[in-house]
């Protein structure tokens, strides 16, 4: 069965995941993580992608981006992926593939669903039982989004900025979101949407996407998430 084509629309947030080949380790030292982040910053600027959230796990990568152009996300992942493989092969005297293949992705509805995806990404190390709290994990954007740590890589999305209200601090309100776990149903919906290259959002969002791309899409969520989870 042919793989479902990616759904990519300029300006619409996209959750991306890139896995190591056979789920093998992709990052071996702190220097590897730092080099990947340097590439991410460089290629995001070059290919016009806003990075809103990220998490580098030992054997896969999560990104939440808003591409400015139809091919921005693909060029971003190609630019980062190829150069990182070259770096790893050179550094560790190895050869061959590092990544599983094509990255997987899903479009994310900004209104009411985007912050769920932020949390999903930055809670990965906690779900993997690597740490007890996302602030303890160095290789994610949590400290940027929740603790106002400086970053050249992260561009805040309008939905994130709106958490601050009139003159408030988005980071303060953002931290409050992590006092409650993301519902397991939503975790499954995000995973299903991403692995299937579908959409994570409501019915109206799915219809709007279908009109833009001229084909049917499947949603990763059967309805609107509850107010309490965002």
Predicted stretch roles:
Residues 1-53, 57, 66-230:
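Short Pro-Cys-Gly-centered "Cys-loop" motif that presents a nucleophilic cysteine in a tight turn
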Residues 60:
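Glycine/serine-rich anion-binding loops at beta->alpha junctions
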């Amino acid at each position: 069965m042919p793989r479902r084509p990616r759904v990519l629309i300029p300006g619409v947030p996209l959750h991306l995941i890139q896995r190591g080949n056979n789920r093998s380790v992709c990052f071996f030292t702190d220097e590897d993580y730092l080099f990947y982040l340097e590439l991410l910053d460089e290629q995001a600027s070059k290919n016009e992608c806003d990075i809103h959230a990220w998490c580098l796990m030992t054997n896969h990568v999560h990104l939440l981006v808003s591409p400015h152009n139809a091919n921005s996300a693909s060029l971003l992942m190609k630019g980062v992926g190829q150069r990182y493989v070259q770096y790893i092969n050179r550094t560790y005297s190895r050869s061959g593939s590092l990544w599983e293949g094509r990255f997987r992705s899903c479009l994310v509805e900004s209104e009411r669903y985007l912050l769920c995806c932020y949390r999903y990404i930055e809670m990965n190390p906690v779900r993997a039982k690597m740490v007890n709290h996302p602030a303890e994990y160095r290789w994610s954007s949590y400290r940027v989004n929740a603790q106002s740590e400086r970053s050249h890589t992260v561009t805040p999305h309008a939905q994130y900025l709106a958490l601050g209200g009139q003159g408030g601090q988005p980071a303060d309100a953002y931290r409050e979101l992590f006092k409650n776990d993301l519902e397991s149903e939503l975790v499954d919906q995000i995973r299903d949407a991403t692995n299937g290259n579908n959409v994570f959002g409501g019915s109206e969002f799915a219809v709007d996407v279908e009109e833009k791309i001229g084909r049917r899409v499947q949603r990763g969520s059967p309805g609107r998430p509850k107010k309490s989870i965002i």
